Each structure stands twice: as C-alpha cells, then as structure tokens.
Amino acid sequence: MLTAAVLSCALLLALPATRGAQMGLAPMEGIRRPDQALLPELPGLGLRAPLKKTTAEQAEEDLLQEAQALAEVLDLQDREPRSSRRCVRLHESCLGQQVPCCDPCATCYCRFFNAFCYCRKLGTAMNPCSRT
C-alpha cells in the first residue's frame, strides 16, 4: 500500500515537468513536416518520403525477375530423373527399407534394439561368402 502511494506521488510530481517540456513546441499550424513537429530546433532528422523508382531501375528489376524465372524453368528441364535404387550399398542405412543390400554377401545388420541398421558383410561358417 505504501509503495502504491509513493508511486502515485512521484507520477503527480512528474506530470507538470512533462507539460512544461511540451509548451516550448512550435504551433501546429506552421508545421510542414512530421520531424519539425517534435523537434523544431533540429532540422532534417531523416524522415523523408520514399524515393520513386526511375524507369531504368524498374526495367532492370523486371529483367532480373524474368531471368530468375527462366533460370528456375531451365533447371527443372535439365535435371535428370532420379534413378530408383534397387539396393542399399555397404555401410549405408537399411533401416525401414524394403530393398536388399547391393552386395549378395551382405545383409541388413541391426544393433541397439533395431534402432541402427546398415548393410554389412557377415562372415559365418555356413555362409558361402564368409571370409576365410
């Protein structure tokens, strides 16, 4: 409660000071630009109307946009169709894929509760591809 009373008193004391600062402003009739309204003693604060584009700049911008559109179309035409892979190479992930490993002696080997799977050659005694 005491804090609210102190803040109220501070605000009431500060209001006359802010009103006195506003009294020194120029009358509103003679003001031509918004930067003169707030600070008449500082000319040119940089508040200017946006510059109009010249016809040369507009033509250059149109040419750039047209060139970008043509480049996108040409990129799509020159792109080769993706080759659908029928197998997974050695040491590449085979997790969730329904295609076999490219190497006939490799198998999809999974570790860490089937969270990490990759094509790997496994050497066993019964496997004809085993390393000897």
UniProtKB/Swiss-Prot annotation:
<dbReference type="Pfam" id="PF05039">
    <property type="entry name" value="Agouti"/>
</dbReference>
<comment type="subunit">
    <text>Interacts with melanocortin receptors MC3R, MC4R and MC5R.</text>
</comment>
<keyword id="KW-0550">Obesity</keyword>
<keyword id="KW-0225">Disease variant</keyword>
<keyword id="KW-0964">Secreted</keyword>
<feature type="region of interest" description="Interaction with melanocortin receptors">
    <location>
        <begin position="111"/>
        <end position="113"/>
    </location>
</feature>
<feature type="disulfide bond">
    <location>
        <begin position="94"/>
        <end position="108"/>
    </location>
</feature>
<feature type="domain" description="Agouti">
    <location>
        <begin position="87"/>
        <end position="129"/>
    </location>
</feature>
<dbReference type="GO" id="GO:0060259">
    <property type="term" value="P:regulation of feeding behavior"/>
</dbReference>
<dbReference type="GO" id="GO:0008343">
    <property type="term" value="P:adult feeding behavior"/>
</dbReference>
<dbReference type="GO" id="GO:0070996">
    <property type="term" value="F:type 1 melanocortin receptor binding"/>
</dbReference>
<dbReference type="GO" id="GO:0005796">
    <property type="term" value="C:Golgi lumen"/>
</dbReference>
<dbReference type="GO" id="GO:0009755">
    <property type="term" value="P:hormone-mediated signaling pathway"/>
</dbReference>
<dbReference type="InterPro" id="IPR027300">
    <property type="entry name" value="Agouti_dom"/>
</dbReference>
<dbReference type="GO" id="GO:0048571">
    <property type="term" value="P:long-day photoperiodism"/>
</dbReference>
<feature type="propeptide">
    <location>
        <begin position="21"/>
        <end position="82"/>
    </location>
</feature>
<dbReference type="GO" id="GO:0042755">
    <property type="term" value="P:eating behavior"/>
</dbReference>
<dbReference type="GO" id="GO:0005102">
    <property type="term" value="F:signaling receptor binding"/>
</dbReference>
<dbReference type="GO" id="GO:0043025">
    <property type="term" value="C:neuronal cell body"/>
</dbReference>
<feature type="disulfide bond">
    <location>
        <begin position="101"/>
        <end position="119"/>
    </location>
</feature>
<feature type="signal peptide">
    <location>
        <begin position="1"/>
        <end position="20"/>
    </location>
</feature>
<keyword id="KW-0732">Signal</keyword>
<dbReference type="GO" id="GO:0007218">
    <property type="term" value="P:neuropeptide signaling pathway"/>
</dbReference>
<keyword id="KW-0333">Golgi apparatus</keyword>
<dbReference type="GO" id="GO:0007631">
    <property type="term" value="P:feeding behavior"/>
</dbReference>
<keyword id="KW-0960">Knottin</keyword>
<dbReference type="GO" id="GO:0005615">
    <property type="term" value="C:extracellular space"/>
</dbReference>
<comment type="function">
    <text>Plays a role in weight homeostasis. Involved in the control of feeding behavior through the central melanocortin system. Acts as alpha melanocyte-stimulating hormone antagonist by inhibiting cAMP production mediated by stimulation of melanocortin receptors within the hypothalamus and adrenal gland. Has very low activity with MC5R. Is an inverse agonist for MC3R and MC4R being able to suppress their constitutive activity. It promotes MC3R and MC4R endocytosis in an arrestin-dependent manner.</text>
</comment>
<dbReference type="GO" id="GO:0005184">
    <property type="term" value="F:neuropeptide hormone activity"/>
</dbReference>
<feature type="disulfide bond">
    <location>
        <begin position="105"/>
        <end position="129"/>
    </location>
</feature>
<keyword id="KW-1015">Disulfide bond</keyword>
<dbReference type="GO" id="GO:0060135">
    <property type="term" value="P:maternal process involved in female pregnancy"/>
</dbReference>
<dbReference type="GO" id="GO:2000253">
    <property type="term" value="P:positive regulation of feeding behavior"/>
</dbReference>
<dbReference type="GO" id="GO:0032868">
    <property type="term" value="P:response to insulin"/>
</dbReference>
<dbReference type="InterPro" id="IPR007733">
    <property type="entry name" value="Agouti"/>
</dbReference>
<dbReference type="GO" id="GO:0007623">
    <property type="term" value="P:circadian rhythm"/>
</dbReference>
<feature type="disulfide bond">
    <location>
        <begin position="110"/>
        <end position="117"/>
    </location>
</feature>
<protein>
    <recommendedName>
        <fullName>Agouti-related protein</fullName>
    </recommendedName>
</protein>
<feature type="site" description="Cleavage; by PCSK1">
    <location>
        <begin position="82"/>
        <end position="83"/>
    </location>
</feature>
<feature type="disulfide bond">
    <location>
        <begin position="87"/>
        <end position="102"/>
    </location>
</feature>
<dbReference type="InterPro" id="IPR036836">
    <property type="entry name" value="Agouti_dom_sf"/>
</dbReference>
